[in-house]
Structure formats: C-alpha cells, structure tokens
From Swiss-Prot:
Listed Pfam families: DUF2463
Top-level taxon of the source organism: Eukaryota
InterPro entries per record: UPF0328
Protein name, UniProt field: UPF0328 protein ECU09_2030
Upper classification of the organism: Eukaryota, Fungi, Fungi incertae sedis, Microsporidia, Unikaryonidae
Gene source species: Encephalitozoon cuniculi (strain GB-M1) (Microsporidian parasite)
Entry similarity comment: Belongs to the UPF0328 family.
Length: 268
C-alpha cells in the first residue's frame, strides 16, 4: 500500500514545483507592465471615456490588481507549504503572516470590483491608472523577489548592486505616501510611478541576464528590519485600498444601512 502511494506524493510535489516555476515565468515582466500599461491607457484615452465606460476602467484595473492577487496567493501557498509552526511564538507568526498575505490577495480582488463601479471624475482617472499601481506594485514585487519567508532566515535577501536598485523601488511609494498624508501633495506620485517602473525594469533585466546571489547567512537585524518595513508599507497601502473599496461599495449598495438593519445595536 505504501509502495504505490509514495510515487504519487512525489509526482504531486514535482507538479507543484513545476507549476510554481511556470507562474514565476508568467509573472516575470508583470510588475513592470502592471505600472506602465495602465499609465499608457490613461494617456491614450480622454477622461470622458473613463466616466462613460466601466469596461475600460475594468481593463485598466485588471492587470495590476490581478498581479497583486496572484502574487500574494503564491506567497501564501509557499509560506504554508514550507513552514510548520513549532511553539506558540512561531505559531502566532505563521498564522498572522498567512492571514496578512490572504488579506492582501482578497483586497486586490475586491478593489477591481469596487474601483470599476466608482465614478472617475476629473483627476481620478490618473489616480487609479498611474498613482495607485505605483503604490502597491513595488512592495509586492520586493516581497516576492527580494525577501525570504522561512523560519530562521526571514528577512531581506538581496546582495550587491541589487540592494542599490531595491532602495528607490521601496522609497518611491513610501515617500509618496508620506507626502500625500502630510502635505496632500499628489504631483510627486507621477515621478514615483516613473522611477519605480524604471528601476523595476532594470531589476528584471538584471535578473534575466546577470542574476546575483541571495544571502544565505544567518539573518542580520537590518535585513529583518527591511522586511518589516516592506510589510508595514504594504499593510498601510492595502488598508487604504480596503477602506476606499468599502466606502465605494457602501455608496453603491448601501452596505452600512443594511448592516444597521441586520444589527440594530450598531445604531448606538
């Protein structure tokens, strides 16, 4: 009985590995295209076209948010398959990170529906097609390519010149987010989108033609700190997107009013 069962497990694991490699090839150029394609569409079509065409809005949103959803789903799958929690602290970390990655994927899918339903007025077409992708694509890309989520080796793994390339990829959305919150400055986001896409393209080309080694040494504190910074930035951005999505869906379907009718105590 066991003799016939072992090869089946081996074939399943091998197929799983091949599927992951296949997805990595598909997602290779996706982060760059996810920023550039919506920006090009925004420049080609007038603002009136976006207001009148939900399908056009859906096409613009589909690529970046689909990349985000698929990438976080893969990260969660790898995290769950490669890790078995031992002890209370590891169990808390395991389930917290698993839920966080799942939440990022779910918010990405929810955002496609919500932002398509929203009315894109004045400069909102620029925000949804240029500004927003330049916020969430960089941390998603860095988490999937430059970080390791393995117990004992959790942290930022890039070395050499890749570190210098990763710095502007990380700082662009971080600086833009601070400027928007503190100064309500949005023009800088256009430059952030350009800089992020350029450095992501440089990183993609370098990985294709001159891949560098990853750090295999015991994780240094600064590497863990960078991973925490990337996760924190991603959490803030996706929390903002979830809030925006729920607000839009509430305006369209009156979700808050329905919730109050179902749970009368929420009126208090």
């Amino acid at each position: 009985m066991n003799i016939t069962y072992v090869p089946e497990i081996h074939r399943t694991d091998k197929q799983h590995t091949e599927n992951l490699r296949h997805w990595r090839k598909i997602l290779g150029i996706a982060p760059f295209v996810s920023i550039v394609f919506p920006a090009i569409m925004c420049l080609i079509f007038t603002k009136d076209r976006f207001e009148k065409s939900p399908f056009l809005k859906f096409i613009i949103l589909l690529l970046p948010f689909s990349y985000s959803a698929v990438q976080y789903a893969l990260l969660r799958t790898n995290w769950k398959s490669d890790n078995k929690p031992e002890g209370i602290l590891q169990s808390i970390l395991y389930h917290t990170l698993s839920l966080l990655l799942l939440a990022f994927a779910a918010i990405s899918i929810l955002s496609i529906t919500a932002f398509t339903l929203d009315k894109w007025e004045s400069s909102e077409s620029i925000f949804f097609s240029i500004v927003l992708p330049s916020f969430f694509i960089p941390p998603t890309y860095l988490l999937s390519t430059s970080c390791r989520l393995v117990p004992g080796q959790i942290g930022f793994t890039d070395t050499g010149i890749n570190v210098l390339i990763d710095i502007p990829i990380l700082l662009c959305p971080l600086v833009s987010l601070v400027l928007i919150i503190a100064l309500e400055e949005t023009e800088c986001c256009y430059y952030s989108a350009i800089i992020s896409s350029v450095f992501i393209l440089i990183r993609l080309l370098r990985e294709k033609y001159s891949p560098s080694e990853k750090s295999t040494l015991p994780t240094a504190p600064w590497r863990v700190a960078i991973l925490v910074l990337i996760l924190t930035l991603a959490a803030l951005i996706y929390a903002f997107m979830m809030w925006g999505s729920m607000d839009i869906l509430n305006d369209h379907f009156g979700l808050l009013n329905k919730l109050k009718r179902v749970f009368p105590f929420t009126n208090a």
